[in-house]
Each structure stands twice: as C-alpha cells, then as structure tokens.
C-alpha cells in the first residue's frame, strides 16, 4: 500500500517566480534551509532542494533532494483539492530539466496534482497513491532510459488513463527524433548522431575522418539541457579548444542551419502540442544563434516584447500556415503533451531544434509589460485541464 502523499511541497512555481524577479530567491532558500533544519520534514527538504536548484547550487541541492526522498517520494502540489481530478505526475529525481513542471503552467487551477519521484533502482516495485489519471513528466536522459523501459511494461494495462506513454518519450532522444522527422512534410531537422570523442580528436588535429560532417556544425554533450555545452564549430582549431574544455566521451553532432531573419536576428519559437492541437508558449528574439528566453534580452527590450506579443496575436495564422508540419509532428511523436522548440526558415519550413515532454511552459514573468504573455498562454492552460477531464470522461 502506498504511503499518504506529503503535504507542504510548493513545487517549482514560487521559486521560478522569484528567480524571474518577483521575489527574493536567496531569501527563500535561507528560509527553507532554516525550516529543514528545524522541522526535518520531507516537504521542507524538497522545497530547499528546489530553491537551491534554481540558484544553481547543484551538489547541495541534490543532497537536500536525497534527504527529502529518504522521507517521502509522493508530494501534493498546491491546487484546488476537493473533487478536482487527481493527476499523478511520475517524475525523475535530479535536475529541474529532468521533468516538466506542470504546476508552472496550471498555477493551481483545475486539477489536483500529485508528484511521485520514482525510485530508479525499483521503478516497478513501488506502490503508487490513488489517482484518476497518470502522466509521465520526465524527458529522455541516460538516467531515465532504464526507468522508461521498466515503466513501459508496468503501465501497459494500467487501469487509469496514462498521459505520455514511455515508448513515445523515448522517441524524443535527439538522434532518434531526427530520424523520425527526416521526411516529415514542412519540417527540417538535420540528422543528429552520436560521435565518439576519438573521431573528433582526430579531426581537431587535421585527420578529418571520412563521413564526419564538415563545419559549421553543432556539438553538445548527450545529456545537456538549456544550451549547456552547446557550441558551433567552424574550424578544427575551435574543435580542439572545445574538446579541451569538455570531458565527455561522446557528443551529439548536427549540421548548423542559419535561421537568421532578414534583420539578422534569430527567432526561436516554443509551441506546445496537446492532443493533436498546437498552442503558443513563447517567442524569443536574439542577436545570437543560440537563443534562450532568459538570455535573449526580452526583459529589457520593448521592441522584442512587441514582436512576441504580435506572435501571440497572429498565432492562428502561423499554425494554419504550418498545419501539415504540426500534424506530422503530433502523429509521429505520439505524445499526448510536449513542447517543441523551432524556428521558421527562409524557405517556409519549420526548423526543429528539439521536442521534449520535460520542457517548461509558463507565463510567470512579473509586471504589466508581460501581461500579453499571461493572456497568450491562458488557452493552453485551459485546454490542458479540459483535455484531461475529457480523457477521464472517456473512461466512464
């Protein structure tokens, strides 16, 4: 029998909000450090771990997370409670990028969320709490692959709706995804493959192996997220310098595609796919080819924000223009819910960077200048709740 879910875990929401400027994140971390020491509860340790992960204090955060998981593995997130449907989120222990923080999208609305951190050593033996539907929130990683394989068998005949089945999540691994989308209509995703370090070291000293992509190309470590370890290689000298700084034994390699617009700026779009429909999440505009919303200058540039606001207003037109591509993405991925990072190429195709069920969708930036984002992401939030309720009605 499963232990009762632990109350008091706040999820990522308050810590992400503070990290975006609506609060004092270091003060929150100090508060939870004090409470963990005084109360010694699973929730206090997990809140401390989440705050420390947001601050980038990874080793200390993982130590706090282990303290929490030694006390409890299932936590209730803030929400409506009562008769609201109970959605059990299966999550991986580890970094924030390991799982989609659904609480940041829903912000306490519509569903009662319970998060269960699976035990990677025994993912099949664990007892799970009562729930109305189950959702796998983890993405693909070296740590998650054996867990997903074990869960595939366990959940095959699960008596409740299962959102994002394990086999579909596995298909989002970068090399697998590029093969999956190779001939998808309206889509461009250059082949991605794992390359052993030894081949790259040979190329760096001038012995370019036959079949190795010529520069420019992109390299990244297999488990990297958020651009960590990602670089563009233009010369053998640059390759040597990169390898000197990266200790990994293999890397993902993919051809670089210049997706700059006529003004020289790069625009990366994040959309969410939900039950075959597509929704806007954000548009980031940057002067650099490696675009992330938090470092693209969106917070201090009203012109960039105006472009994102226009993107939300005209998204229906964008989605209609790329309907065959989005239809192919939904069908081939086979995921109920995920986010996709992409750009629009000069020839009108969607350049796919990644598709990941663990990506975050939110509109938690404070201030009136981001009101358009809160309005723009509301349709996804409302549709997600309706979609889950619809899945439950299908079973009755």
Describe each model-derived feature in a short phrase.
Residues 331-335, 344-396:
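C-terminal active-site "lid" helix and adjoining low-complexity regulatory extension at the edge
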Residues 217, 279-280, 338, 351-354:
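Protein kinase-like catalytic core scaffold
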Residues 139-142, 222-224, 358:
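Short glycine-rich anion-binding loops that position phosphate/pyrophosphate groups of nucleotides
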Residues 74-202, 207:
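Conserved N-proximal alpha/beta basic substrate-recognition cap immediately N-terminal to
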Residues 340-342:
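Hydrophobic residue at the +6 position relative to the catalytic HRD Asp in the kinase catalytic loop
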Residues 181-183, 190, 209-228, 248-263:
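ATP-grasp fold ATP-binding core
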Residues 231-325, 329:
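Phosphate-binding site of ATP-dependent enzymes
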Residues 1-77:
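Alpha-helical protein-protein interaction scaffolds
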């Amino acid at each position: 029998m499963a232990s009762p879910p632990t109350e008091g875990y706040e999820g990522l929401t308050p810590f992400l909000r503070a990290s975006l400027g609506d609060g004092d994140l270091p003060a929150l971390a100090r508060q939870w450090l004090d409470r963990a020491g005084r109360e010694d509860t699973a929730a206090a340790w997990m809140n401390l771990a989440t705050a420390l992960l947001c601050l980038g204090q990874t080793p200390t955060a993982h130590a706090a997370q282990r303290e929490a998981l030694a006390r409890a593995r299932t936590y209730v997130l803030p929400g409506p409670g009562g008769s609201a449907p109970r959605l059990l989120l299966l999550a991986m222990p580890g970094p924030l990028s390991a799982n989609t923080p659904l609480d940041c999208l829903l912000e306490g609305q519509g569903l009662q969320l319970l998060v269960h951190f699976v035990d990677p050593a025994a993912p099949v033996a664990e007892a799970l709490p009562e729930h109305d539907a189950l959702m796998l929130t983890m993405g693909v990683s070296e740590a998650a692959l054996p867990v997903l394989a074990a869960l595939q068998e366990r959940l095959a005949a699960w008596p409740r709706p299962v959102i994002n089945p394990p086999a579909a999540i596995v298909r989002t691994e970068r090399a697998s995804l590029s093969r999956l989308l190779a001939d998808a209509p309206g889509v461009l995703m250059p082949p991605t493959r794992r390359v052993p370090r030894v081949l790259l070291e040979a190329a760096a000293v001038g012995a370019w192996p036959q079949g190795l992509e010529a520069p420019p190309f992109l390299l990244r470590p297999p488990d990297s997220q958020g651009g960590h370890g990602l670089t563009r290689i233009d010369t053998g000298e640059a390759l040597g310098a990169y390898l000197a700084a990266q200790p990994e034994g293999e890397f993902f390699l993919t051809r670089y595609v210049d997706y700059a617009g006529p003004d020289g700026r790069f625009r990366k779009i994040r959309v969410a796919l939900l039950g075959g429909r597509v929704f806007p999440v954000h548009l980031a505009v940057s002067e650099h080819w490696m675009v992330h919303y938090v470092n693209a200058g969106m917070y201090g540039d009203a012109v960039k924000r105006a472009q994102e606001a226009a993107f939300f207003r005209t998204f229906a037109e964008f989605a209609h223009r790329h309907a065959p591509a989005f239809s192919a993405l939904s069908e081939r991925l086979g995921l109920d819910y995920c986010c996709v990072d992409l750009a629009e190429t000069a020839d009108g195709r969607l350049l796919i960077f990644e598709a990941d069920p663990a990506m975050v969708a939110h509109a938690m930036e404070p201030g009136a200048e981001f009101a358009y984002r809160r309005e723009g992401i509301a349709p996804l939030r409302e549709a997600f709740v309706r979609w889950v309720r619809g899945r439950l009605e299908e079973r009755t």
